[in-house]
């Protein structure tokens, strides 16, 4: 299994990093997880052909993980893709379709079938991929309740099983505790270092994880405690590098 990080930046755009997006290749499958801004351009840079993607996963509805998806779909349409494309969404697929319609982007016009599924259904289509709920969006509970909004606060981490073990893409999280049962026996973890408190990241060195890749920025507290990150285990995400798992 191969991991390529297309975007490792935080929600605030930076000149030297792209927004969240990763490619996972296993045997004949190619999966795109999250589609931050410029994702379509990044796929072109990596020479990903129109027919090559098997599925796209969106872990949660924040713009830095989602807003590139619309251009990816438009690109695949204009490239005359024919093969069915699975799109796994975190919540409320009907609302997503309304946004497509707002943009005058109609799946009915695509030359391929866009098969929209709930992200919980991943295992039904790929026996080596499953989604785990996390705590990233719980902080919105009060405003959702106050204004009676339809948001469901669903945010997900993704697990991919390979020959050497399990790869976990945490996506955005508030704590590592919320998915610790999933993390502790992983081979490689791509972990959000921009939201959790420093101790939540540092304590991962006491698990059996072989490699911990820090992405999505870094908190000031973790920056101050970088000397506690064992360089044999921890490293900062490098875009365009192919990681073997």
Where are these regions (language model features)?
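Core dinuclear metal-dependent hydrolase active-site scaffold
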Residues: 1-46, 118-178, 241-245
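Active-site neighborhood of phospho(di)ester-bond hydrolases with catalytic His/Asp-centered motifs
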Residues: 32-36, 53-64, 89-90, 168-171, ...
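Active-site metal-binding motif and surrounding structural segment of the metallo-beta-lactamase
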Residues: 38-88
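Hydrophobic packing residues within well-ordered alpha-helices of enzyme cores
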Residues: 43, 69-72, 96-101, 179, ...
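Structured loop/turn residues at beta-strand edges in well-structured enzyme cores
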Residues: 48-51, 124-127, 184, 207
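P-loop/Walker A phosphate-binding loop and immediately adjacent motor/lid segment at beta-alpha junctions
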Residues: 72-86, 148-154, 201-223
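Acidic/polar short surface loop at catalytic or gating sites that assists cofactor/ion binding
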Residues: 84-86, 91-121, 132-142
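Binuclear metal-ion centers of metallo-dependent hydrolases, dominated by the metallo-beta-lactamase
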Residues: 176-188, 196-245
């Amino acid at each position: 299994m191969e991991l390529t990080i297309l975007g490792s930046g935080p929600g605030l755009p930076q000149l030297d990093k792209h927004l969240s997006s990763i490619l996972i290749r296993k045997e004949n499958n190619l999966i795109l997880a999250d589609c931050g801004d410029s994702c379509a351009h990044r796929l072109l840079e990596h020479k990903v052909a129109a027919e090559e993607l098997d599925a796209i996963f969106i872990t949660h509805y924040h713009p830095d993980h989602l807003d590139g998806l619309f251009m990816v779909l438009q690109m695949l349409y204009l490239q005359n893709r024919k093969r069915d494309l699975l799109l796994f969404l975190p919540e409320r697929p009907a609302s997503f379709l309304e946004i497509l319609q707002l943009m005058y982007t109609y799946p009915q016009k695509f030359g391929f079938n866009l098969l929209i599924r709930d992200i919980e259904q991943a295992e039904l289509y790929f026996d080596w991929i499953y989604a785990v709920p996390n705590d990233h969006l719980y902080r919105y509970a009060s405003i959702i309740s106050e204004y009676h909004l339809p948001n469901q606060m669903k945010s997900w981490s993704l697990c991919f099983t390979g020959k050497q073990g399990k790869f976990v893409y945490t996506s955005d999280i508030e704590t590592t505790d919320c998915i610790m049962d999933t993390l502790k026996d992983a081979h490689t973890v791509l972990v959000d270092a921009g939201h959790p408190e420093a101790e939540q990241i540092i304590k991962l060195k006491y698990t059996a994880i072989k490699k911990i890749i820090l992405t999505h920025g870094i908190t000031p507290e973790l920056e101050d405690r970088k000397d506690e990150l064992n360089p044999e285990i921890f490293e900062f995400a490098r875009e365009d590098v192919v990681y073997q798992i």
